[in-house]
Amino acid sequence: MEYFGAIDQGTTSTRFIVFDNSGKIVEQHQEEFNQYFPDEYSVEHDPQEIWISVVNCIEAVLKKIDINHISSIGISNQRETTVAWSKSTGNPLYNAIVWQDTRTQSICDDISNNNNIKEDIKRTGLPIATYFSLSKILWLINNVPEVQSSLEKDDVIFGTVDSWLIYKLNGTFQTDVTNASRTLLFDLHSLKWNENLLNEFNIPSNSLPIIKPSLHNYGECKSILEGIPITAVLGDQQASLFGQHCFKKGEVKNTYGTGCFALTNTGDDIIYSKNGLLTTVAYQYGERNVKYAVEGSVAIAGAAVQWLRDNLNLIETSEQ
């Protein structure tokens, strides 16, 4: 029997799920991890705690199934959340700044007033907002001495959660196009980091991971799941679009999770919305076959239920 494993690393919890060839779930395990709120604007995760939750979920599943049946694994992850870690030690230099975090509004205001990069920003498909990775990277550079000194020594990697997990699994610096397209540094047309934006903000290209297609061999795991290849990586909402078989232009999916996200497959076309939708990569398989999407998002959906549970104590479980 051949199985496929999936790491689903979300905003509030992590799952490891094993599927058979028919797509049926064979086994799974889920674990929540800590949320940190330094102030009313900030939301952080401990990257090591994220990794520990992944390891715990995998180990729990491997107690019930034979690892030799798992032929490959994929990664689906919370998007935009940004991690900075040392190339030499592999240790995080600061907590991960989560997509919900709004501390970088003043940085975004400065970017908005910069007329030199308006066309380059347009090529990212995204509005200038605290939601995306660019302002988080700039905040880390400007406010964390360990990041500043590591940047000067060419010893820092800025990555989204997929990059962090790939690094922990096999020691490489890689990301996929869907996650890269959520950074405000990715060119939708060239499918590369936008050099003008990198130069404008003094972000060295070698401080960012290498961009690969969503369906790609990212190498074999060297730690837990040793020898098993990583063959797919997508941001969680794009993974949902793919998982719901929205392969045709015009097909739509909507997900209610921590937030609410509706994505429409636009096929080969890069469509810029006039009504506040985001333009993003849907998925890519092979070097050339890339599909795009437009996205509408609401930051707070299930997060409101968690707030009622954890902050107001009006309920004991989310199911209530």
Predicted regions span which residues?
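Residue-level signal for inorganic ion chemistry
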Residues: 23, 46, 73, 101, ...
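Short beta-strand-loop/turn "lid" adjacent to the catalytic site in phosphate-handling enzymes
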Residues: 59-99, 127-133, 162, 166-187, ...
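Active-site core segments that coordinate phosphate-bearing ligands/cofactors
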Residues: 5-6, 105, 112-126, 132-174, ...
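Glutamine-centric residue-chemistry signal
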Residues: 9, 30, 78, 100, ...
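Helix N-cap/coil-helix junction residues
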Residues: 67, 202-206, 314
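A conserved helix-loop-beta module that forms one wall/lid of the active-site cleft
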Residues: 198-216
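N-terminal glycine/serine-rich phosphate-binding loop of ATP-dependent small-molecule kinases
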Residues: 1-94, 106, 122, 149, ...
